[in-house]
């Protein structure tokens, strides 16, 4: 029997998820149908579209911009949230809470939310062989993308964490909120800076801003160094990566994070682990 | 495998369709799940909700106020419309055009629209034993409800048809549009009147207005008589029926039409005919 999945967003035509998950389905030998699902940008429409999908017998949904926070609210009021989703304050993966279904709770009341973005980043770095355990890490950006990776990074054993943002107060607020939301995070001292003041040596620096979209560049000082530089963006020239590659750092864009988070969602839905290295190679052949 | 259905409307909490179709499923021995589906009142939300439902593997959807015209537009641009839906200019039943699916057309492009409201009325009258063949029929009202029953009545062999409306011009416009939309209707001369001017003897008079909701009464003259009076409304006191029952007419409200249109939708989706008399009795036991 075909298992049905969607990725819901607005806009959505550009999403690569259908091709990625269709390849996963082939790799896992499962009959799946994964499609893009447009939705008007309001909470009532999102809830209605998600309800209709799960009413129809859908198995799982990915959630992308602008619905990750709305999905969070939806699940918080129904079937619950994973710890990563709770701390991230956002959901990118929807499924049905099987325990609740078994108790006869209707599908739409059993909606459960997870967030695999952060773990997808960590898994990609580990595949790259970057030394997360004991690492001195800096994240540039204090929005949703940054929020989603802090806990997974801490769980991966990093030593120290700094968060920098154009306006430092936003970074401070993020740290306060995260420390309240998670005891694990609360045990870490997280330094905060204005981006222009971030300096010194780090093992890993992560660009969690969408500045790559606008062609602007980050105000990075020359006194800022790292061994590894990661930009969550992909599919375009990334000045952030160039800045550090000419200074001898190893760099990576976020395409592997995209595959990583997708593989984790797929596993969440089907219980089947994906050989991400093999899938990435296969996808690169598809997309070139 | 569970077959999934929804009724989509706004508001929708009041809909009786889930109970009706669940009973049909039991009667037909099919594993079905039929649920109410709220949707924000705009075309983009409706299209997104319907797409998500069929993406999820949904089999069929009923459409009620305020989406019947939007559903019509949706299907006209995709998998097509039945003749009844085309002439009614509205869709109450959505399914997937199997011929298109077989050609690899994706579900959302194979969306097919039917309208079973009018035939549901005709079938109910025939169950009541009312003599449609050769009947002189009058319809009061010139909105969507009236529009949906003209072709089925003509196909049932009525002799003459008059359409009355508070403002007669609306009835005239309806007749013009219907005659253009259907050759069968075009061959009939349909008289039009202001409701207050409708008089003489009819076999059947149908109230296709929603005046029953507001508690107002229709401006019916004493020179208007009929053997059978039908009000499409149900579930409340209906002054229209009282007006004619005290004048010796046989009367019926529209509950049987609701069951009739549902049975036709069910048959459209599953290929299984429903024993409507048996179902109606069973439902009356459920609802009392």
From Swiss-Prot, chains A, B:
Enzyme class label:
oxidoreductase
User: Which terms are listed as keywords in the entry?
Assistant: Amino-acid biosynthesis, Aromatic amino acid biosynthesis, NADP, Oxidoreductase
Q: Which residues form the signal peptide?
A: none
Tagged with keyword ATP-binding: no
What is one cellular component GO term in this UniProt entry? Answer: cytosol
Catalytic activity of the protein:
shikimate + NADP(+) = 3-dehydroshikimate + NADPH + H(+)
Q: What processes does the entry annotate via GO biological process terms?
A: amino acid biosynthetic process; aromatic amino acid family biosynthetic process; chorismate biosynthetic process; shikimate metabolic process
Q: In which pathway does it act?
A: Metabolic intermediate biosynthesis; chorismate biosynthesis; chorismate from D-erythrose 4-phosphate and phosphoenolpyruvate: step 4/7
Q: What is its EC number?
A: 1.1.1.25
Q: Where shikimate is bound, by residue?
A: 15-17, 64, 92, 117, 234
The record, for SUPFAM superfamilies, names:
Aminoacid dehydrogenase-like, N-terminal domain, NAD(P)-binding Rossmann-fold domains
Listed binding positions for NADP(+) are: 83, 141-145, 165-170, 232, 254
**Active site (catalytic residues):** 68
The UniProt GO MF terms for this protein read: NADP binding; shikimate 3-dehydrogenase (NADP+) activity
The family this protein is said to belong to: Belongs to the shikimate dehydrogenase family.
PANTHER family hit by this protein: BIFUNCTIONAL 3-DEHYDROQUINATE DEHYDRATASE_SHIKIMATE DEHYDROGENASE, CHLOROPLASTIC, SHIKIMATE DEHYDROGENASE
Q: What does this protein do?
A: Involved in the biosynthesis of the chorismate, which leads to the biosynthesis of aromatic amino acids. Catalyzes the reversible NADPH linked reduction of 3-dehydroshikimate (DHSA) to yield shikimate (SA).
Describe its partners and assembly state: Homodimer.
Q: What is this protein called?
A: Shikimate dehydrogenase (NADP(+))
Source organism per entry reads: Psychrobacter cryohalolentis (strain ATCC BAA-1226 / DSM 17306 / VKM B-2378 / K5)
